[in-house]
């Protein structure tokens, strides 16, 4: 029941669902962070937590001098260790397992991360949601208000559609060159996504004792090595068998040392989770970096904006598009780009055609803000409940 409760809480938090009439205020790379990555991390957190609750995450073997539950609890809440110098010795003849053996004069590698894995995964899930939360609050529903009634597959009368298009066009013309703050907020959150995934890679590397950076490449090398010579790097980072030392007082008051052998069954799960996260973080960092570079190109090169607009408005002449782009600042372009993702092709093409004519014929006055438009006697935006039958759910 506790596991189902956690699943319900997580699903209510990340709200992974798709609405045809939901306002689009970001791109696919952005959604890979707050939807896919957050869902992956929270799911892994639930799986590890359920494994700890249902099974025995650690089972230690001793000579019977110490109760089993005592030594299990002690080794779980403190740490276990392996001997790196004993990793490559023959199992069954020289050592009992990888990293186990005579520890005299040998360096020890301590393992205490396993008790913190669910908490770290949950914290990482929150980290990947933060940029979206920041952007959603800074965006403040602007695109949803502008495009309300024309998004998705909602069928509306032609008169209503034309009226809505005219109002969107009026807002856009009247608010021309006032959206730069809006665009810079978006690009800042896009950069925040890239920084966040890089920080997470270094954070996990620190958490696993500096072994995460080369974890994926080591596993790939291992799979290509000769069967008789290879050593699994996953066992070195996530050992199944470890040692634990328990001290207690003997009958005469002297300190007695008890060596125990601990089986960490949960590491079979941990190694699979982190090898997947290694590849996913590398992919996510790559596409996020490309997205940031792409945004820089769009900001610095107006010809790129012409190409993007032309792609969604194929019937226009390049001269018309070039004239339109010259009148638009980067914030206006971003609003126009989001409109292309939320409006139907017909509505967007009609609006662009009228926009090219209007901006080519007149200068634009200063504009009211989106909030001011809600207080004028004839509001540009009709009530949300006019179409759709209910309140829109946002992520």
From Swiss-Prot:
Query: Where are the Phosphotyrosine modifications?
Result: 381
Per the record, membrane topology reads: Multi-pass membrane protein
Q: Which residues lie on this side of the membrane: Extracellular?
A: 59-114, 205-272
The membrane spanning regions, by residue number, are 38-58, 115-135, 184-204, 273-293
Q: GO cellular component terms?
A: apicolateral plasma membrane; cytoplasm; gap junction; lateral plasma membrane; membrane; plasma membrane
The disulfides recorded in the entry are none
Subcellular location, record wording: Cell membrane; Cell junction, Gap junction; Cytoplasm; Lateral cell membrane
User: Which processes are annotated in GO (biological process)?
Assistant: dorsal closure; intercellular transport; monoatomic ion transmembrane transport; phototransduction; phototransduction, visible light
Signal peptide position in this chain?
none
Q: Which family does it belong to?
A: Belongs to the pannexin family.
Protein source organism: Drosophila melanogaster (Fruit fly)
Topology Cytoplasmic: residue spans: 1-37, 136-183, 294-395
Q: What is this protein called?
A: Innexin inx3
Question: Which gene produces this protein?
Answer: Inx3
Q: Report the main location listed first in the record.
A: membrane
Function summary: Structural components of the gap junctions. Essential for proper epithelial development of the epidermis.
Q: Describe, from its UniProt entry, the tissues in which this protein is expressed.
A: In ovary, expressed in nurse cells and follicle cells. Expressed in embryonic epithelial cells. Ubiquitously expressed in stage 5 embryos. Expressed in foregut and hindgut from stage 11-17 and in proventriculus, epidermis and CNS in stage 16 embryos (at protein level). Expressed in anterior and ventral regions in stage 8 embryos. Repeating epidermal pattern emerges at stage 11, refines to one or two cells at each side of the segment borders by stage 13. Expressed in the imaginal wing disk. In pupae, expressed in the CNS and in secondary and tertiary pigment cells of the retina.
Q: Which UniProt keywords apply?
A: Cell junction, Cell membrane, Cytoplasm, Developmental protein, Gap junction, Ion channel, Ion transport, Membrane, Phosphoprotein, Transmembrane, Transmembrane helix, Transport
An MF annotation (GO) of this entry: gap junction channel activity
Can you state the subunit structure given in the record? Heterooligomer of Inx2 (via cytoplasmic C-terminal region) and Inx3 (via cytoplasmic C-terminal region).
Q: Per its UniProt record, what InterPro entries does this chain match?
A: Innexin
Q: Which residues carry this modification: Phosphoserine?
A: 366, 377
